[in-house]
Amino acid sequence: MAEKEVPLTAVKVEALVVMKIIKHGSQAFPTTATGSIVGMDVDGTLEITNSFPFPVVEVPAESHFDNTAPNPAAAAPRAKANAAYEAEMVRMMREVNVDANNVGWYTSANMGNFINMNVIENQFFYQKEMNERTVALVHDVSRSAQGSLSLRAFRLSPKFMAAFKENKFTSEELQKSNLRYQDILVELPVEIHNSHLITSFIHQLQTPTQATPSDLPPSLAALESSQYAKSSVLAPNFDNLSLSIDPFLEKNCDLLLDSIEVHHTETNNFQYYQRSLAREQAKITAWQNKRKTENASRAALKQPLLPEDEWQRLFKLPQEPSRLDSMLNSRQVEQYARQVDSFVSATTGKMFAVKGNLLPGETAK
């Protein structure tokens, strides 16, 4: 194992592990799939060489339609039963001479909605109990289905680890520690690694070549009607002018609006707390002023003074709600916004190109 003083800079994942994670996530979709990853830390690079899924807990059929039902798969990495199962699997791997150092866990996601309390608690459990240098691999099944593999590695920042350990997420504590929602997760670059045998085999594969015509066409008409002329790379591709919006983009926009509504609700709750606190503080101030006036009168009459700290028993200040949920939701809004930004570039250009035809009275400039 590498020295702890060397910070983690990258994550190298074997291609076989990536395929196992993709298969597990696709089979469990749309529910969450979780599992453990093993490997070793080499000079600041976390090499992940194997993985195995956590046991599946059967869920009653009626709970699939209950939004408030708990998700046992999402909480599986920190379950006591799975911790014993993970230790037994690691022991068996060591018996067959496989890299069996626990380096983290993986989870599947849908539309990038992986920033939630389950992921935070799981990663906190691994970094605190298992190994401080563990990571969480997040595989987005929906994004990967679009043709581009989405596999990212995250760790909790030391600043957030300290705040989560003490469970101090009040406004005062956040201002003191300067903790922002951008500081919750630290992303590490992911590199997919193949063995030398697989790399050599891929380089030996021959690219199929198209057959060339053996005889020249007898006329220009025959040349224009041949399959080689029709398949020319210079032929215009009108599919690029399609104005259909990607369903993935539409769903991301819906999720973004939902997260913004949740953020608005959290803001209203905090403002209600501030108004309640201001009312109670005004009552306390009025009571203290009245008590001081009474004590001044009693002092003039040489009577015993009344206690001025009695307000602590008479009044109860409202407790400030935790800002953790608001921070996680803000980080999720940022995640959705980045995904939307990556998908709108092509569609936005097309919409501006036909703006003059879509809106009457305007001409495209």
Curated annotation (Swiss-Prot):
Entry's PROSITE patterns?
MPN
Q: What is its main location?
A: cytoplasm
GO MF terms here are: metallopeptidase activity; translation initiation factor activity
A cellular-component GO term for this protein: eukaryotic translation initiation factor 3 complex
Q: Kindly give the SMART domains that the UniProt entry links to this protein.
A: JAB_MPN
Kindly give the CDD domains that the UniProt entry links to this protein: MPN_eIF3h
Q: Where is the MPN domain?
A: 11-160
State the InterPro entries in the record.
eIF3h, eIF3h_C, JAMM/MPN+_dom, JAMM_MPN+_peptidase_M67A, MPN
Listed under GO biological process in this entry are: formation of cytoplasmic translation initiation complex
Keywords in UniProt for this one? Cytoplasm, Initiation factor, Protein biosynthesis
Q: Where in the cell is it found?
A: Cytoplasm
Matching HAMAP family: eIF3h
Which proteins does it associate with, and in what oligomeric form? Component of the eukaryotic translation initiation factor 3 (eIF-3) complex.
Record's family?
A: Belongs to the eIF-3 subunit H family.
Q: What does this protein do?
A: Component of the eukaryotic translation initiation factor 3 (eIF-3) complex, which is involved in protein synthesis of a specialized repertoire of mRNAs and, together with other initiation factors, stimulates binding of mRNA and methionyl-tRNAi to the 40S ribosome. The eIF-3 complex specifically targets and initiates translation of a subset of mRNAs involved in cell proliferation.
The protein, known as: Eukaryotic translation initiation factor 3 subunit H
Q: Which organism is it from?
A: Aspergillus niger (strain ATCC MYA-4892 / CBS 513.88 / FGSC A1513)
